[in-house]
Amino acid sequence: MSTKETVIDLFDRLFMEDVSDMMDEDLFDAGVLDSLGTVELIVEIESIFNIKVPISEFGREDWNTANKIIQGIEELQHA
């Protein structure tokens, strides 16, 4: 499964939201993510992708869309 497919599946599983049609939409403004959801998401991302997401890297503006989350994961995988 690609990173994109995994992230879409993760949002569906954690938040019961299909983000496949809103890949560039701000997930905080859309009500998909909040502070608690962000923590849940980070924990799952770290587990699934076997990476460490430094809190300093997870700024709202840097990870506020599904595409930015995918990009961030891929950057951390290749760091």
Curated annotation (Swiss-Prot):
Residues 1-77 form the Carrier domain. Pathway: Cell wall biogenesis; lipoteichoic acid biosynthesis. Keywords: Cell wall biogenesis/degradation, Cytoplasm, Phosphopantetheine, Phosphoprotein. It is found in: Cytoplasm. GO terms for cellular component: cytoplasm. GO terms for molecular function: D-alanyl carrier activity. Pfam families: PP-binding. The keyword Flavoprotein does not apply. Signal peptide: none annotated. GO terms for biological process: cell wall organization; lipoteichoic acid biosynthetic process. The keyword Signal does not apply. InterPro entries: ACP-like_sf (IPR036736), DltC (IPR003230), PP-bd_ACP (IPR009081). SUPFAM superfamilies: ACP-like. 4'-phosphopantetheine is transferred from CoA to a specific serine of apo-DCP. The modification O-(pantetheine 4'-phosphoryl)serine is found at residue 35. Gene3D superfamilies: ACP-like. HAMAP family: DltC (MF_00565). Carrier protein involved in the D-alanylation of lipoteichoic acid (LTA). The loading of thioester-linked D-alanine onto DltC is catalyzed by D-alanine--D-alanyl carrier protein ligase DltA. The DltC-carried D-alanyl group is further transferred to cell membrane phosphatidylglycerol (PG) by forming an ester bond, probably catalyzed by DltD. D-alanylation of LTA plays an important role in modulating the properties of the cell wall in Gram-positive bacteria, influencing the net charge of the cell wall. Belongs to the DltC family. This is D-alanyl carrier protein. The gene is dltC.
